């Protein structure tokens, strides 16, 4: 099949298997070039391992620390007539490349919120690894099917209290728009906490703990974003922020539990990056285009892989074995460079002066678009997209 990008709204409905593999290879090459991770965990579970920060975490563990990895995700495999999702191809590429290096890699595809996912993961750990010493929780799902009732709960990307209006960019037409979003209802806020908060992370860790598959000293980390006053109304001060605060609550509970056996639980606050998740949040594409340009100029720009490698080597698994620096909420802060005052002042000053005419000049908007399409395996110079490719990629994955 010849595969071209098809964009609908803020998602690309096609993915290119060769391009996705190239993306994974690029992240592996970066990790290897940085050198091995000292004190790295050797048996790692990544819940939400098929794209973004979750995929980079699996790569860091495997190719930076020689870890055996189990990945859990919810992706669509390819059919004769339709390509699979980018996450399917990313995971297939990871599996192939890990096995080429003699690394253990197994994957489970299905609803990570379900009891079945947790039980199948436990069974796999018991059968193959015995125990695990790191759990990365990196789910980014807009809906959660409640395991007890089957009820489907949906999250909302809305402000709280009052309607939020701000400059945003229509990424299909490449023009600035005024985006207005009605405030979330109390029910929508509660539902967002249910979907994107810390409940399921707790359920995972408690299930793994009760099954006896967490090794002494096991660390767990879940990913969050706080951002700045530019994005706060829709993010940290919105319904999503309430969910991320619940993640902090869960981290505290889990840290108390795991510290009894020498382990830890932390939220890691990461920088803004181009992901399928962030592209859905109004204001984020424009903010990302601005902040990326300034961070590149300052020499502190990072993508997912760079961030996660820094989290492993300079926070959780430092070469000297010392405890990681944390903020007052016991979070690992990897957004420190993005939040530098000079970088944020630049974005604040620029916000009111950006126009349709200067959008591509004052912000890295073209780079934003390029990175977005690259998530799905497109726009990579070394690939000829007019060549017929095999879409039916199989690998060591079990359906939940």
Curated annotation (Swiss-Prot):
Disulfide bonds: none annotated. Keywords: Fatty acid biosynthesis, Fatty acid metabolism, Lipid biosynthesis, Lipid metabolism, NAD, Oxidoreductase. One of its GO terms (biological process) is fatty acid biosynthetic process. The active site is at residue 235. It is an enzyme of class 1 (oxidoreductase). The record marks 75 as: Plays an important role in discriminating NADH against NADPH. Pfam families: Eno-Rase_FAD_bd, Eno-Rase_NADH_b, Enoyl_reductase. Substrate binds at residue 225. Pathway: Lipid metabolism; fatty acid biosynthesis. Monomer. Belongs to the TER reductase family. This is Enoyl-[acyl-carrier-protein] reductase [NADH] 1. It comes from Photobacterium profundum (strain SS9). The lineage of its organism: Bacteria, Pseudomonadati, Pseudomonadota, Gammaproteobacteria, Vibrionales.
């Amino acid at each position: 099949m010849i595969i071209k990008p098809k964009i609908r709204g803020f998602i690309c409905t096609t993915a290119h298997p060769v391009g996705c593999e190239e993306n994974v290879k690029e992240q592996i090459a970066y990790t290897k070039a940085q050198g091995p991770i000292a004190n790295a965990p050797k048996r790692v579970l990544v819940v939400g391992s098929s794209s973004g920060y979750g995929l980079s975490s699996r790569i860091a563990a495997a190719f930076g620390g020689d870890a055996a990895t189990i990945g859990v995700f919810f992706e669509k495999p390819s059919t004769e007539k339709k390509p699979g999702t980018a996450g399917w191809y990313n995971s297939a590429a990871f599996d192939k490349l890990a096995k080429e290096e003699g690394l253990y890699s197994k994957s489970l595809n299905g609803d990570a919120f379900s009891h079945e996912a947790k039980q199948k993961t436990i069974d796999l750990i018991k059968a193959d690894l015995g125990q695990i010493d790191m759990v990365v929780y990196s789910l980014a799902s807009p809906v959660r099917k409640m395991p007890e009732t089957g009820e489907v709960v949906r999250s909302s990307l809305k402000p709280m209290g009052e309607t939020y209006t701000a400059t945003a960019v229509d990424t299909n037409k490449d023009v600035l728009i005024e985006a207005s979003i009605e405030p979330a209802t109390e029910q929508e806020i509660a539902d967002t906490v249910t979907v994107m908060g810390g409940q399921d992370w707790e359920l995972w860790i408690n299930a793994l703990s009760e099954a006896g598959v967490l090794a002494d000293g096991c660390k767990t980390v879940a990913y969050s974003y706080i951002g700045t006053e530019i994005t706060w109304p829709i993010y940290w001060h919105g319904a999503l922020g309430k969910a991320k605060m619940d993640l902090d609550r869960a981290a505290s509970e889990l840290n108390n539990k795991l510290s009894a056996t020498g382990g830890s639980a932390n939220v890691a606050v990461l920088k803004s990056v181009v992901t399928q998740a962030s592209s859905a949040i109004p204001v984020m594409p424009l903010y990302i285009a601005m902040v990326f340009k300034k961070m590149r100029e300052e020499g502190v720009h990072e993508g997912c892989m760079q961030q996660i490698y820094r989290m492993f080597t300079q926070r959780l698994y430092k070469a000297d074995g010392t405890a990681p620096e944390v903020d007052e909420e016991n979070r690992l802060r990897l957004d420190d460079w993005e939040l530098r005052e000079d970088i944020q002042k630049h974005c604040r000053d620029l916000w009111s002066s950006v126009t349709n005419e200067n959008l591509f000049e004052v912000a890295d908007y073209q780079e934003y678009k390029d990175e977005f399409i690259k998530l799905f395996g497109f726009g990579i110079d070394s690939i000829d997209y007019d060549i017929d490719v095999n879409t039916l990629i199989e690998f060591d994955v079990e359906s939940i």
